[in-house]
Amino acid sequence: MARNKGGLRFQPSGGARGPAIPVGKKQRLTIERLAHDGRGIAHEAGMTWFVSGGLPGEELEARVLGARSKVVDARSERLFSSSDLRRREPCTVAGRCGGCTLQHLEHGEQLALKQRTLQEQLQRFAGIEPEEWAAPLVGPEFGYRRRARIAVRWDARARRLDVGFRASASQEIVAFDECLVLVPPLQTIARALPALLQDFRKPESIGHVELFHGTASALLLRHTTALVDEDRQRLAAFCSAHQAQLWLQGAEQPLPVEPAAELGYSLGDWQLTLAYRPGDFVQVNAPVNESMIRQALDWLAPTADERVLDLFCGLGNFSLPLARRVARVVGVEGVAAMVERAGANALANGLGNAHFFQADLSKALAEAPWAEQGFTAVLLDPPRDGAFEAVREMSSLGARRVVYVSCNPATLARDAGEMARQGYRLKRAGILDMFPQTAHVEAMALFEAG
């Protein structure tokens, strides 16, 4: 379910303090290897340096962003020697924008880094390795994001509205001419958006903007004070010109300006359409999402007469394709609104064999009424915190096969260790390249009862 983008960031290491290093200081370094978050690692004068933009083997000059204990966070500013792994970034704000952190690294090496991260985390936290490594699931390198959040900030002193993406390791807003990772319809809207917002009569009322694309395009504007009619009309005309729905959000939940407006996305292989609202979790990469569902169902390999449990089911992204194949699917989710929408999606797609329940998945499952008859096949798609309490009960649920989809290799590895303690074997694992140009790792693992 809901993911927070991230990776290994600056963390104090504890122990004796190293020499004080002022922010802004420049240091010549040789990069030794990559951290899991894609930053280069170097050692100098007893300090470990994490350098954004550095690649193994490179000699560079880095500027200090922050330092504590024996760890320094820095950014590459000048190259003396370049790695063969380096490529020219196609984006004009790469290195400044906080969205794409790996554009300077060849895509094949991005995949290798993510594979290495998964392998090392499984070894570190669980001491295990899968019997088989699956090939990475990949999609387009660019033009894949169907959702984006654009930062907006009114500078009262300068009488200026800043519109763009958050910078890496700061609160700066980086303006952009185009964003290459967005799907083309959202690129068009994003390119025209700054000029629209900067013409607002009351730009200080804008909080941020989110863009969505699926069965329709949509623009959500979060406002901190009521919009004046003139600005509201500008927004409506802009959205009409770009064939996009307009949604507004004040202190309450997002609401469409046109009450009949609906957002959704299609899963063509299963002839499904799933409705959602701004704020609901939806995978941002449509091609990889479909490949992920296909692989999950292939690995789980449910028979037509099986009961399948889908934990952290959300809108029914896995539940409804499963319901096309098996006798009964039970989806469980912690957020009541998502449970309601999953049920509505099942009904809208004519699936009477998918049933959804709300439950706190950090607590015991075996006592729940929906769990009484047990399940031989289970699918989990938890948030970054993982599913430790749920996996502790896999054997009591009767699960013979478990597919675990993860957005955090560290918690997947921790939970894999618990699965191993219950007698499950890690049959297969692999990465899902849901976020090309970033170090974010999604993964899938198949466990079978021993």
UniProtKB/Swiss-Prot annotation:
The name this protein goes by in its record: 23S rRNA (uracil(1939)-C(5))-methyltransferase RlmD
CDD domains in alphabetical order: AdoMet_MTases (cd02440)
GO BP field: rRNA base methylation
Annotated source species: Pseudomonas aeruginosa (strain ATCC 15692 / DSM 22644 / CIP 104116 / JCM 14847 / LMG 12228 / 1C / PRS 101 / PAO1)
Residues involved in [4Fe-4S] cluster binding: 91, 97, 100, 179
Top-level EC class: transferase
Residues at the active site: 407
Functional description taken from the UniProt entry: Catalyzes the formation of 5-methyl-uridine at position 1939 (m5U1939) in 23S rRNA.
Pfam (any one): TRAM
Keywords: 4Fe-4S, Iron, Iron-sulfur, Metal-binding, Methyltransferase, rRNA processing, S-adenosyl-L-methionine, Transferase
Region annotation Disordered: where it falls in the sequence: 1-22
Similarity-based family: Belongs to the class I-like SAM-binding methyltransferase superfamily. RNA M5U methyltransferase family. RlmD subfamily.
EC number: 2.1.1.190
NCBIfam families tied to this protein: PRK13168.1, rumA
TRAM domain sequence ranges: 20-78
InterPro entries named in the record: 23S_rRNA_MeTrfase_RlmD (IPR001566), MeTrfase_TrmA_AS (IPR030390), MeTrfase_TrmA_CS (IPR030391), NA-bd_OB-fold (IPR012340), SAM-dependent_MTases_sf (IPR029063), TRAM_dom (IPR002792), U5_MeTrfase_fam (IPR010280)
Disulfide bridge map: none
UniProt-annotated binding residues for S-adenosyl-L-methionine: 283, 312, 317, 333, 360, 381
Catalysed reaction, written as an equation: uridine(1939) in 23S rRNA + S-adenosyl-L-methionine = 5-methyluridine(1939) in 23S rRNA + S-adenosyl-L-homocysteine + H(+)
GO molecular function, one term: RNA binding
